[in-house]
Amino acid sequence: MITHLQKWSLLALLAAGSLSAQEWKPSDWPVLKHYDKEHLFQIALPLGGIGTGTVSLGGRGELRDWEIMNVPGKKYSTVTTGNNAPFFSIYVKSQDNIPVTTLLEGPLYSHEYLHYEGRPVNHHGFPRFAEASFDGAYPFGQVNLSDAELPVTVKIKGFNPLLPGNADDSGLPVAVLAYEVTNTGDSPLEVSVCGSMRNFIGKDGSKF
């Protein structure tokens, strides 16, 4: 249960194809550049150690550009396309309202429904947050999600294991994500954050 202004976070460690989680203590991060909802389509923060490949945190919260198989994979999401691409979602239930499950991503742009092969963008039919923005200060990036119809805001924080002067630790094959949820109302909420990620070993993104 979370109450007003309390935050819960999920730490997701992606290393060697594995996923683990633990509680994260929220803290303020530096911001050098802010991008609003209209300028997120090409925003992607590469997450991963030096020389280990990366997966990028997109400007609206999506996981994209999975380049961990030693080949370029821009736009690769581990699948051709569809609702089985990796994603995180949030479940919110108050004491007196119907529970809601929403994709932890901001809105799509209209042109993303116009693929040259006639197929839609990943998760095109999922409910999403209405508002999104991105704050960057490499190696840190933050996606800010909000919606007037939801009693929570979410901040997605991602960063690299970049330690200047320490090549070994900077080369760890790891990406770090934290999902911070804030209750914007006065009533307690039941909140869960969960993720779905298929095993895509054997695919490198070169023929997607």
Feature locations, PLM:
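Extended, loop-rich substrate-binding clefts of extracytoplasmic carbohydrate-active enzymes
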Residues: 108-174
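Bacterial N-terminal signal peptides that target proteins for export
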Residues: 1-9
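Hydrophobic h-region of N-terminal signal peptides that target proteins for export
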Residues: 12-21
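Beta-strand-rich N-terminal accessory domains
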Residues: 22-108
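Extracellular structured ligand-interaction cores
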Residues: 40-42, 51-52, 63, 87, ...
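An acidic- and aromatic-residue-enriched active-site/binding cleft used to recognize and process polar
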Residues: 50, 57-60, 68-71, 95, ...
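Polysaccharide-binding surfaces and accessory modules of carbohydrate-active proteins
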Residues: 79, 156, 161-208
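Composition- and surface-driven signal marking solvent-exposed, interaction-prone regions
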Residues: 2, 19, 57-59, 67-69, ...
